[in-house]
Amino acid sequence: MAKGQSLQDPFLNALRKERIPVSIYLVNGIKLQGQVESFDQFVILLKNTVSQMVYKHAISTVVPSRALPVAATNPHADADENQ
C-alpha cells in the first residue's frame, strides 16, 4: 500500500464512520458539503440532499466540521506510543 493511501484511507474512513459533515474544496475553487458515504482509490461518494461522486484528482482540500480523534486517523497510534 502506498504511503499516501495509508494516511488517506483511515482519515476518510473515520469521517465516514462518525458521519462527520465535511467541506470538500475542488481545485477549481468550488466548495462541496456533505458526509462521506463511501470512497475508493479514485473517488469519494459525498451525500447531502443528493449523492455526488467526486474524483479525488479534482479535490484540493477536505475539511471536517469538527476535529477527529488522533486514534481514529492513525491505525498505528498504539505502536507510536510504545516507542
Curated annotation (Swiss-Prot):
What are the entry keywords?
A: RNA-binding, Stress response
One of the record's GO molecular function terms? RNA binding
Q: Where is the Sm domain?
A: 9-68
Output the PROSITE patterns linked to this UniProt entry.
SM
Record has RNA-binding as a keyword: yes
Do you know which CDD domains this protein is assigned to? Hfq
- What Pfam families is this protein classified in? Hfq
Recorded superkingdom: Bacteria
User: Would you name any one GO CC term?
Assistant: cytosol
GO biological process: what's one of them?
A: regulation of translation, ncRNA-mediated
Q: Which InterPro entries match?
A: Hfq (IPR005001), LSM_dom_sf (IPR010920), Sm (IPR047575)
Query: Which family, according to the similarity comment?
Result: Belongs to the Hfq family.
Q: How does it assemble?
A: Homohexamer.
Q: Which purpose does this protein serve, as stated in its record?
A: RNA chaperone that binds small regulatory RNA (sRNAs) and mRNAs to facilitate mRNA translational regulation in response to envelope stress, environmental stress and changes in metabolite concentrations. Also binds with high specificity to tRNAs.
Q: What protein name does the entry list?
A: RNA-binding protein Hfq
Q: Which species is listed as the source?
A: Pseudoalteromonas atlantica (strain T6c / ATCC BAA-1087)
